[in-house]
């Protein structure tokens, strides 16, 4: 049997960090806005006719094997830690090889690890006979990722991976609700440049410091988060109205707010790239994820996307990413045929 799954990464436009529990409980109306992009995370499982478990990450260049009898050792396995903990959680009863690959650059701030998490959960769940309904995938993903990074993890990334599209994610005491946003996606695609700066980042470190300070009662951080909440809600309204002038204004005004929350959200190289984009037709810059490296999304003036991309491509180490909006989220496909089994 062969199982293949894929899920899209995302660009977050507003509300980042407020999706981390328990922070959203302190800000009534907390929400994020993001859209899924066609830089996919993929997982492939091939069953075996022995008891071996083989885990391989193509983009990380890592591979190791164990056995069904030693599956409990995966709980504390440092190699390919996310994959190991997911396999330990699902505890399949047949030998298999699991291979993963991500199209997004490592440390890009596009939710690559969270997206891979969802893709692997979809495939592993199929392997164990659809033990969980899809509505359980996101809570499982958040719990396992928290075990890996050892700090609380935000929830918005899993929703874009599982469902795709453009959405506002609303965080309430009784539930987290995904609201699909019906907007002019064509305009979104022709006005946003996604740039990988060439500098990877660690989102857990940045977000944990902010979370700790918020819980410790830092009033300035509380007020910044109130503004982040308002930005998300205002951006949602502007997108639903297809008011792209207002979208640009909101994104431009939110950048200093994010810098106040985390001064290290940009590096000197990122500041250089942002200034170059703004001088060549970009209206606003949005650092993707927790920042400190990774990707930047630029909202451009009408008919200016190509000029912005050309200017940024001239900078050493920077890579303009080719993306499309991904309307589809997680997909899982099964091929059941004994001829695909890996022999002893």
Which stretches of residues belong to each language-model region?
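Short pre-catalytic strand/loop immediately N-terminal to key active-site residues, enriched for Gly-Thr
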Residues: 104-108, 283-285
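DPxDG-like acidic metal-binding loop motif
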Residues: 110-134
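Arg/Gly-rich low-complexity intrinsically disordered repeat tracts
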Residues: 337-344
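Conserved catalytic cysteine-centered active-site region
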Residues: 92-99
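Glycine-rich active-site/cofactor-binding loop and its immediate structural neighborhood
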Residues: 293-295
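C-terminal nucleotide
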Residues: 1-14, 18-20, 26, 34-35, ...
